Amino acid sequence: MKEPLIEISALNRIFQAGEQQVAVLKDIDLKIYPGEMVAIMGTSGSGKSTLMNILGCLDRPSSGSYRISGRETRELDDNELAALRRNHFGFIFQRYHLLSHLDALGNAELAAVYAGVSKSSRRERAHMLLSRLGLEERCEHKPSQLSGGQQQRVSIARALMNGGEVILADEPTGALDTRSGQEVMAVLRELHQQGHTVIIVTHDPLVAAKAERIIEIQDGEIIADRVNPASELETSASSATDAASAAGRKETRGAWLGRFSEAFKMAWVAMTSHRLRTLLTMLGIIIGITAVVSIVAIGEGAKQKVISDINSIGVNTIEIFPGKDWGDERAAAIDTLVAADVEALQAQPFVDSVTPSIVNSQQLRYRNVAVNVNINAVGEQFFRVKGLVVAEGRPLLREDIRTQAQVVVIDSNTRGKLFAAEDDPIGKVILIGASPWTVIGVAEDKSDMFGGGGNLSVWMPYSSATTRLIGRQNFSSIIVRTPDGLSSAVAEQGIIRLLTVRHGVKDFFTFSTDSILKAVEKTTTTLTLLVSSIAVISLIVGGIGVMNIMLVSVTERTREIGIRMAVGARQSDILQQFLIEAVMVCLIGGGIGILLSFGVGALFSLLVQDMQMSFSVTAIVSAVVCSSLIGVLFGFLPARNAARLDPIEALARE
């Protein structure tokens, strides 16, 4: 004896309506055998559609048993039920339920996407099915370009895509004219003859009369189950085998890639169909990413500018001062920094060059011009230590130090005050205090962060200054330049050890540009983090905007979600689709934000001449990662809501 394909016993379906329970199906017992063409007939509200939903695994019974090929559906989880819908059932709906943004081919092959069939195979089969149904010339037409009968035939092709072992037709002719209805019924009869099990749900006795078996349902109970003697249908056993084999096809290895591609395509279509809304959704992300990347670039540019300015006062330099630290009241009485210390330091391997320094202020006169200048009594290596370039004439030489020559190098500011642009200052004699001094060179102006660019400076041999102007032999400080590549900390420790031994006591302290650099880097990093944290708030607000719009999108596309679930989409497929959409919105918004930040950088360079924004790959990659994370975090809730939708309720939405 043939085993039933579908077996229902003592099945009940009860819905909660407020505080009351409504029994829609009551103790249903039913067996349907492979290859049968069955009509379930009843008036509106009789429970026939609810029964069809349970048969198609779109709904679960409240109690009782429902077996498919001997398998109890009550024990199956959501993904296993989706597999049954995908591999065994094909739905034909009264309102067609085609996706408006897909053409006939795309709608027909939808079930195969979730079954993991390769793109080429599903395209070939979809084209074959549509051609068999008389739609060969309409494959690339959207639903809005098809008649009702043509749309219904597309839905039949979709139902057959994965084999369609069981065809569930809900009022298949209800929205069609007489001729189209007859054509659809002819197709269903043909499918039955090919071996498909066809179950038609209808209120129309004329439609039911086309089936070989008629089941009447009223008030949730089966009141009649009879063979239709008027039916003269025959079933092709060979075709039934073909249908079953088609339904049992396994997923290809690249199935996940096909589903991902479909999800990506659907996300893109959803975004482009609401361009303004998508742009407004991106706006918060765009502003946030632009702000973060720009602020980090400004911070990095500012740090580089400050470092450059620090380097302008001496590259890799360590200064030695008398006393224990800044503000030491006894420092003025300490006179141990002398020329012998300079000579000793010069001989050390951790010293590139060294110069003493005594700073004083004097009045300088040339002809009828008198100005106050900073007098810098230094050694011959001063210009190397400080990285200054003598543009005219020559720098100080060791011979000048030895002979206590009354020569000076002036800066470009002093040159501008004393001499006309066309005059040659080299060899001119100026008065500093009451002593005559000969100008031997002009140093290039090297403005720095400490505002030295506007001062007037003069450099002279320390040996001459101590005897003719200052009247003391000890130095205000000694400045050491360390070799490139040598750690300042190593050199600093060597200097401290050497001078402590020479003086017998540590009566000095050191100050290096390295400590300034570290302080600057720490400060700029702190400020960048502070301002970036404010910009991140914009990103969070943008993420909330993405979540809100995605929730709206889920509501708008509820029917689409129901259709996808009906053809076999898993909850994970729906979750993936909406997550991809959220991530795409955020990634594109992040990309636009990065491009805008480059625009901000170009504008910044026009407005601020002495500083450039510095864009780093790390900041840009971080922005992209941040955009993706926002998409995942704020897109998860809407995506989860979409995946948890009840397919029956989703299909009922308009």
UniProtKB/Swiss-Prot annotation:
Family of this protein: Belongs to the ABC transporter superfamily. Macrolide exporter (TC 3.A.1.122) family.
GO CC annotation: plasma membrane
The protein's name: Macrolide export ATP-binding/permease protein MacB
Subcellular location: Cell inner membrane
Disulfide bonds: none
Main EC class the enzyme belongs to: translocase
Alphabetical keyword list: Antibiotic resistance, ATP-binding, Cell inner membrane, Cell membrane, Membrane, Nucleotide-binding, Translocase, Transmembrane, Transmembrane helix, Transport
GO terms for MF: ATP binding; ATP hydrolysis activity; transmembrane transporter activity
Function, in words: Part of the tripartite efflux system MacAB-TolC. MacB is a non-canonical ABC transporter that contains transmembrane domains (TMD), which form a pore in the inner membrane, and an ATP-binding domain (NBD), which is responsible for energy generation. Confers resistance against macrolides.
GO biological process terms on file: response to antibiotic
EC assignment: 7.6.2.-
Coiled coil: none
Subunit structure: Homodimer. Part of the tripartite efflux system MacAB-TolC, which is composed of an inner membrane transporter, MacB, a periplasmic membrane fusion protein, MacA, and an outer membrane component, TolC. The complex forms a large protein conduit and can translocate molecules across both the inner and outer membranes. Interacts with MacA.
Sequence positions that bind ATP: G42, T43, S44, G45, S46, G47, K48, S49
Protein's UniProt keywords contain Transmembrane: yes
Organism name: Hahella chejuensis (strain KCTC 2396)
Membrane topology (UniProt): Multi-pass membrane protein
Main location: membrane
CDD domains according to UniProt: ABC_MJ0796_LolCDE_FtsE
TM regions (residue ranges): 279-299, 534-554, 584-604, 617-637
ABC transporter domain residues: 6-244
Designated gene of the protein: macB
